[in-house]
Amino acid sequence: MGKIVRISGPVVVAEDIENAKMYDVVKVGEMGLIGEIIRIEGNRSTIQVYEDTAGIRPDEKVENTMRPLSVELGPGLLKSIYDGIQRPLDVIKETSGDFIARGLNPPPLDRKKEWDFVPAVKKNDIVYPGQVIGTVQETSLITHRIIVPDGVSGKIKSIYEGKRTVEDVVCTISTEHGDVDVNLMTTWPVRKARRVVRKLPPEIPLVTGQRVIDALFPVAKGGTAAVPGPFGSGKCVSGETPVYLADGKTIKIKDLYSSERKKEDNIVEAGSGEEIIHLKDPIQIYSYVDGTIVRSRSRLLYKGKSSYLVRIETIGGRSVSVTPVHKLFVLTEKGIEEVMASNLKVGDMIAAVAESESEARDCGMSEECVMEAEVYTSLEATFDRVKSIAYEKGDFDVYDLSVPEYGRNFIGGEGLLVLHNTVIQHQLAKWSDANIVVYIGCGERGNEMTEILTTFPELKDPVSGQPLMDRTVLIANTSNMPVAAREASIYTGITIAEYYRDMGYDVALMADSTSRWAEALREISGRLEEMPGEEGYPAYLGRRISEFYERSGRARLVSPEDRFGSITVIGAVSPPGGDISEPVSQNTLRVTRVFWALDASLANRRHFPSINWLNSYSLYTEDLRHWYDENVAKDWGSLRSQAMDILQRESELQEVAQLVGYDAMPEKEKSILDVARIIREDFLQQSAFDEIDSYCSLRKQYLMLKAIMELNSYQSMAIDHGVTMDNLSSLPVREKLSRMKIVPEDQVESYYSSIIKEIHKEYTSFIGEKNAEANI
């Protein structure tokens, strides 16, 4: 039995630990806190503790469990929510309430639940490592395959059928070295990668249904991708702001917050100057979504601090005080745009709810512009003109409602304005063709993790209609949890992903965010008094990041039959200030082969997914070209290249247009700008809230891109024959092309054919049939 000699935050030094080995799990102090040995010098062992060490004293005991940090693998992983060291959060809530009591270590898998085991082999059969000996229907979507452990082969001595718990023996195998019992559950050390026969080249794409990803920047199954995710931007309102509830009543947001805070069923999470209330019963409100006002709900209330507020008053008597970065919907001649409060001007038209049926038409804009913006709804949306804008300085309490599924806004303010709110969308988890999703919330703020924990269980798998959680494992490790557990959460998640890969499944693992993991490494390194590297990160940062990403890949698995599986790792990095030149981003980009550059300016223009096509890249494009040619179309690669060339050319021509003016540009260059706009708005832009547009099959993507390139070809031909863009820009087929994204999958082939015919008909009316045929 060892004893503590030194404590430094999450790092504890103990001496005389019995049989101490690197990465052994130990129980620290009288409370039995879980820790891991990370350094041994003589009789002294350095331990990183995965729980808060407050109150631990020198000379308290340290007990060695004689085993490395491991995870339990078996039926019951799916639909579970764990912390960084695989403690089930739902079980902990029942045991200790809303906060995790120290020293608690409940089993990750339910020991009492019985699973219906169906054997796939029979007595006296010869089995080999990796062979499937039976199955369990884990969820409605996933069949859990029980396989022979690695290194075990022999004859089946006995096998059972029917109801079994995870600890029950389902099979006994006679080997050269004695009998080996196989349970439904096994354990595996998290730092050790599970063995495969060989890694395979990345030749099959992970289809996401997002056009900008699948068409321009694809990721392969078994590939690696990096996504920069900047910190939140604090879009809040003052406490005096009324919120319009679905029952027709209004209540000040500070009073709403106070009343919900008093309810015992709600969970209050407090941080430095911030509080978040996790609501058991969601608040029913209204939101503005795609031009209509709909009933919505919020499960999160936020309270924070701000030194400045912007007071906005309108001609119609409406008013609201918001933080400078808060966005409002502004009606312009081009449509509806989101504008930060600090950028609003007197005279701007901001979205509101009409107080009378006639007010929607009496908002000072032309009827054509209002109709184009689609502001008529059952609640009569309108726009009100800003009369005055004033800045207020002081120490203000500010509040927010989180409304992730309903346009990220709510109706509130004096006179009912549309108030913005933001949250990350998880389209990849919902739509990618991976069988299993493992989501690791590594050091993210509590309110962001709560969004995920409350949103995921309510999402439906779009293919099967079953709950998305039926194929998902969530690992929640918030920023106020001990930093050491952040590192463990990354390894816990990748080990669970490897387990399902070994069954032959395609797994998508999302780590959000690896920057927080790196910050944990930096803090532990500092406590260990190691020589710091760049920006204080340890010198081995690059090696740790590469070791994690190297566990991805598509592989031929250990099995007597041909079985293949893959792990696709998508890691979010959160560089301070969005600076991707810092060490974590650079080391991540060095080992990942896809980079999706999120662009705040695109998000501000309501262009989603807001992936910048000029700064993003995919090194899998050439590897996947053969698959696309064989499974989609022979000219897929050339269409992609044409689209990328046009977008690249547009960025160059925009600088020229700003210097000389659009009207002074040659018609050819006007045409390039025009086609690039069509690609951006009608192809790359995609609505996550539209039932049809939220997912786009590869075939539909191909036909959309083919139609745009066909239009580009005819347009270029027409300009060669002296036709101007003024004549071409008003052709009816262009509007039909813009609607192609909302055409159902079963109608897209006929719709494409009609578009091609109309393009030929309308453009040849300018240049003549013979000229068109000659040029084609």
From Swiss-Prot:
Chief localization: membrane
Lipid bilayer topology: Peripheral membrane protein
Keyword Coiled coil: no
Gene Ontology BP annotations: intein-mediated protein splicing; proton motive force-driven plasma membrane ATP synthesis
Localization, UniProt: Cell membrane
EC number: 7.1.2.2
UniProt GO cellular component terms: plasma membrane
Coiled-coil spans in chain: none
Tree of life domain: Archaea
Record key words, sorted: ATP synthesis, ATP-binding, Autocatalytic cleavage, Cell membrane, Hydrogen ion transport, Ion transport, Membrane, Nucleotide-binding, Protein splicing, Translocase, Transport
First and last residue of the signal peptide: none
Subunit structure and binding partners: Has multiple subunits with at least A(3), B(3), C, D, E, F, H, I and proteolipid K(x).
Family: Belongs to the ATPase alpha/beta chains family.
Record's miscellaneous remark: The intein interrupts the ATP-binding site.
PANTHER family linked: H(+)-TRANSPORTING TWO-SECTOR ATPASE, V-TYPE PROTON ATPASE CATALYTIC SUBUNIT A
Name under which the protein is recorded: A-type ATP synthase subunit A
Lineage, highest ranks first: Archaea, Methanobacteriati, Thermoplasmatota, Thermoplasmata, Thermoplasmatales
